[in-house]
Curated annotation (Swiss-Prot):
Entries under NCBIfam families matching the protein: greA, PRK00226.1-2, PRK00226.1-4, PRK00226.1-5
Domain of life: Bacteria
The family this protein is said to belong to: Belongs to the GreA/GreB family.
Regions crossing the membrane: none
Protein name: Transcription elongation factor GreA
Entry annotated with the keyword Amino-acid biosynthesis: no
Length: 158
């Protein structure tokens, strides 16, 4: 499996989810299966089927998270030397050159991305356009409405 970049905050979030799945969700579903079995005939036992489906989901998610964490390259942007270059984990303030509107994004791994929170996937068009550029540079981004040009106003490692 290839190395997956993830921020320290993203890795901590995955570890917390894994802990919850193993210590809360898994024991709960095992108990639910046990209670459903105690009701007798399993062929028409909806509670049993639901619990078994839930168990399959939980076990699959545990394996998925463990795989991601084992392949993760955890990057803590607060440890970067002060600079002006856009890299994975950096927070970038942009200004739309056409409208003057400002927007701030942090470049994160795919599991962390949430555009509503300003977290953009390293593989997204905007992140690919920004990586390697410096404060004061312009970046062209292919957006659904056409090409947009942004000026990189500030780069922070927070």
């Amino acid at each position: 499996m290839a190395t997956l970049p993830i921020t320290k905050r993203g890795a901590e979030k995955l570890k917390a989810e894994l802990h919850n799945l193993k210590t809360v969700q898994r024991p709960w579903v095992i108990n639910a299966i046990s209670e459903a079995r105690a009701q007798g005939d399993l062929s028409e036992n909806a509670e049993y089927e639901v619990a078994k489906d839930r168990q399959g989901f939980i076990e699959g998610r545990i394996q998925e998270i463990e795989g991601k964490l084992s392949a993760a390259q955890v990057i803590d942007p607060t440890t970067f030397e002060t600079g002006t270059r856009v890299v994975f984990g950096s927070t970038v303030k942009l200004e739309d050159e056409a409208t003057g509107d400002s927007v701030t994004y942090q470049i994160v791994g795919e599991d962390e991305a949430d555009i509503k929170l300003g977290l953009v996937n390293i593989g997204s068009p905007i992140a690919r356009a920004l990586i390697g550029k410096d404060e004061g540079d312009s970046a062209e981004v292919q957006a659904p409405g056409g090409i947009r040009r942004y000026e990189i106003v500030t780069v922070l490692y927070i």
